[in-house]
């Protein structure tokens, strides 16, 4: 997902979700 919101917790940056 290119426009994946932080709420979706993108697999590209799982650490960014926290």
Swiss-Prot record:
GO terms for cellular component: extracellular region. GO terms for biological process: regulation of blood pressure. Expressed by the venom gland. It is found in: Secreted. Keywords: Antimicrobial, Hypotensive agent, Secreted. It comes from the Eukaryota. Belongs to the non-disulfide-bridged peptide (NDBP) superfamily. Long chain multifunctional peptide (group 2) family. Antimicrobial peptide. May also inhibit angiotensin-converting enzyme (ACE) and potentiate bradykinin (BK). This is Probable bradykinin-potentiating peptide. It comes from Tityus metuendus.
């Amino acid at each position: 997902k290119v426009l994946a919101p932080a709420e979706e917790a993108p697999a590209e940056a799982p650490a960014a979700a926290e």
